Amino acid sequence: MEFCHTETLQVVRLSQNATIPARGSPGAAGLDLCSAYDCVIPSHCSRVVFTDLLIKPPSGCYGRIAPRSGLAVKHFIDVGAGVIDEDYRGNVGVVLFNFGNSDFEVKKGDRIAQLICERISCPAVQEVNCLDNTDRGDSGFGSTGSGACGGRDTAWYIS
């Protein structure tokens, strides 16, 4: 599989600890982000882990910081809200949550998250008196998924 990279993600290393983001495979949507420092995330706590990178997404895009599935499944580590706006120029930090019962050790150079560049729309905001009606209306929080799994609600758990 061959991909054409016509856009550029600009990156500046703030220290020698920084690792340039890279894809784990040629077809990967995300670029791996690595920790620039050793740290410990205590059980049931969160920490901001810095990459020592400045990142400028391509024009018309933002960078979404997303979890790495292996960290979630094996160590109960998840990534908090992470958006790199097109005009942000600070050190990229990754919010890591440790939902496990043991402290989690992060080493310098560990892959802690992935960066996905996504196109954005920046619409103007218009206040109106009402919105048009739809069949769905104000039904939310699972209303469209009821009975989707053979007539019963199903949840999958990994133990």
Curated annotation (Swiss-Prot):
Catalytic activity: dUTP + H2O = dUMP + diphosphate + H(+)
The enzyme's E.C. designation: 3.6.1.23
Family: Belongs to the dUTPase family.
Native organism taxonomy: Viruses, Varidnaviria, Bamfordvirae, Nucleocytoviricota, Pokkesviricetes
Organism: Orf virus (strain NZ2) (OV NZ-2)
GO biological process: dUMP biosynthetic process; dUTP catabolic process
Named cofactor requirement(s): Mg(2+)
Gene from which the chain derives: DUT
Enzyme class, broadest EC rank: hydrolase
Protein name: Deoxyuridine 5'-triphosphate nucleotidohydrolase
Function description: This enzyme is involved in nucleotide metabolism: it produces dUMP, the immediate precursor of thymidine nucleotides and it decreases the intracellular concentration of dUTP so that uracil cannot be incorporated into DNA.
